[in-house]
Amino acid sequence: MTNLRKTHPLMKIINSSFIDLPTPSNISSWWNFGSLLGVCLIVQIVTGLFLAMHYTSDTMTAFSSVTHICRDVNYGWLIRYLHANGASMFFICLFLHVGRGLYYGSYMFLETWNIGVLLLFAVMATAFMGYVLPWGQMSFWGATVITNLLSAIPYIGADLVEWIWGGFSVDKATLTRFFAFHFILPFIIAALAGVHLLFLHETGSNNPSGLSSDADKIPFHPYYTIKDILGMLLLILVLTSLVLFSPDLLGDPDNYTPVNPLNTPPHIKPEWYFLFAYAILRSIPNKLGGVLALVLSILVLAVIPFLHTSKQRSMMFRPFSQCLFWILVADLLTLTWIGGQPVEHPFIIIGQLASILYFLLILVLMPITSLFENNLMKW
């Protein structure tokens, strides 16, 4: 009798995706972040569901409903902080996952990469709308500032902003629709992640060398299931440590102040994971230019496969490209730092230089360096 997992219509899909999947034998821990992102998504959906049972999306009661969750609901504080810090872990895993793709040339799987870029946009949209829901000062002013950016779009901008707000300012209608979208988007993200995996399994995984691994494949289970479980345990350890010891480390104290539309916080800034894009937005004095730069800072990822000029796929054997990659990482860390600083000298000029360097590295320096390395190898 043939094994049930190989014949049952549903088990067959699971088997070919997680058990008998032929996997390169040399993939490193950098390949763990896909499964960790899956864990993060499940944690966010489960904790979010329990939060939604007690949350009210009304401007009068939203803030107090979050307070009620933390004070009166059994382990409500734990669920709330798991959800808030789970978002931070989600973005840490996302950035490392994208960084791995850039370093090892995984972007050559075009469909997988493009779905990944779409996923990144969807997760960023979800996180932004989630940040508005507690209805603290930073929630309100963050929503006002970011939605207002759409008014930079010529001709339809002003109408578009009022359409999103559902009125003439960020108010009850805005909060209600943001809650609705924040609830539905994670399920869309889960579906997109399924498509992401579908495209990945069409080609098979890349590996650190960037070479074909068809001659040396091993089954996913037990080798990589146990490796993924170790990664998950480490992720849960870091998340629970953060939640139980310093849950507000990555948050903004301004969000513990209820909304006051008449009082603007001294420094309006988003959560830490958006600071790099926020710094790029602020580095351009023109409103429309800033919005375009903001969108392009993420959208530039979709262009990277077409700028791949090297004869090798991975950066493993390309020391000059490696140098530029780590300069890019340092540049992104600099932008993250600048995004959290006030708009004054010397932060303005540092932000502008870091923004120029970001686009220069990706669009110009990396492709030219790859051509130079090809010549070094006499190709």
UniProtKB/Swiss-Prot annotation:
Gene Ontology cellular component annotations, sorted alphabetically: mitochondrial inner membrane; respiratory chain complex III
Chain positions recorded as heme b b562 binding sites: 83, 182
Membrane topology: Multi-pass membrane protein
Transmembrane segments: 33-53, 77-98, 113-133, 178-198, 226-246, 288-308, 320-340, 347-367
Protein keywords: Electron transport, Heme, Iron, Membrane, Metal-binding, Mitochondrion, Mitochondrion inner membrane, Respiratory chain, Transmembrane, Transmembrane helix, Transport, Ubiquinone
Molecular function, one GO term: metal ion binding
Compartments reported by the entry: Mitochondrion inner membrane
A GO BP entry: mitochondrial electron transport, ubiquinol to cytochrome c
Family of the protein in this entry: Belongs to the cytochrome b family.
Assembly with partners or alone: The cytochrome bc1 complex contains 11 subunits: 3 respiratory subunits (MT-CYB, CYC1 and UQCRFS1), 2 core proteins (UQCRC1 and UQCRC2) and 6 low-molecular weight proteins (UQCRH/QCR6, UQCRB/QCR7, UQCRQ/QCR8, UQCR10/QCR9, UQCR11/QCR10 and a cleavage product of UQCRFS1). This cytochrome bc1 complex then forms a dimer.
Other comments on record: Heme 1 (or BL or b562) is low-potential and absorbs at about 562 nm, and heme 2 (or BH or b566) is high-potential and absorbs at about 566 nm.
Role summary: Component of the ubiquinol-cytochrome c reductase complex (complex III or cytochrome b-c1 complex) that is part of the mitochondrial respiratory chain. The b-c1 complex mediates electron transfer from ubiquinol to cytochrome c. Contributes to the generation of a proton gradient across the mitochondrial membrane that is then used for ATP synthesis.
UniProt-recorded name of the protein: Cytochrome b
Lineage start: Eukaryota, Metazoa, Chordata, Craniata, Vertebrata
Gene encoding the protein: MT-CYB
